[in-house]
UniProtKB/Swiss-Prot annotation:
Residue sites binding NAD(+) per the record: D44, G45, N114, E115, D144, A152, T155, A156, Y157, N158, Y159, S160, A179
The protein, known as: NAD kinase
Gene3D superfamilies: Probable inorganic polyphosphate/atp-NAD kinase, domain 1, Probable inorganic polyphosphate/atp-NAD kinase, domain 2
Record's catalysed reaction(s): NAD(+) + ATP = ADP + NADP(+) + H(+)
Encoding gene, per UniProt annotation: nadK
Amino acid sequence: MTPQRIGFVASPAPVAQEALVAMEARYGQCPLPEAEVIVALGGDGFMLQTLHETQSLDIPVYGMNRGTVGFLMNGYAGDGLRERLAEAEEEILNPLVMTAVTEAGEVFHRIAINEVSLLRAGPQAAWLKISVDGKVRMEELVCDGALVCTPAGSTAYNYSAHGPILPIGADVLALTAIAPFRPRRWRGALLPKTATVRFDVIDARKRPVMADADGRSVRDVVSVEVRSEPAIRHRLLFDPGHGLEERLIREQFV
């Protein structure tokens, strides 16, 4: 079915704003809650922002690249948008839920589509204890940080930290160390998608750590739990033959 009600959103970048004006003039603008499809104009960062902001609407999002990276985006073209939307293939992403507790006892809940990362917030290395499903798996990881990522997020920070690229349909999460010092050769682990990962910060006052969920940070954490949330669905649309599975494969041969 060819969608008629399209809601456009765009990043503040001039090139994205220019595209927004052109698209609205050509296809009209529908309020997002009433739209059949949301079209996001920008880069991957703006796509993540759009998915977070429209999470409660359960409306598919089609990205058009007006940014830098565009891994989650389709190519930009002014012509034939309705036809592209009618032929687009849908991918379902389940995000991560982060529960972070600070030294002051505050509890923060965050959603992450790509990854949850812990990073040292001072000059000294972070010391982390890692548990999986309530069982301690590593008493002490000395590192710059660690992260847990989804398959969709495995080509982002995880890949830069030498973590594995995960097939989009894989029911696994990647746990990846960031610049590990001890154990020196430990890079991480592949875990079931149902796993709950807990990080406890050792000597948090001397070695402060921050937690980050898709760019939203919590400082001075003492513990962080991360798990996948199957009840939350993000719906992404891609042009045929250019879905996330193909992109993940392609990234490994660049």
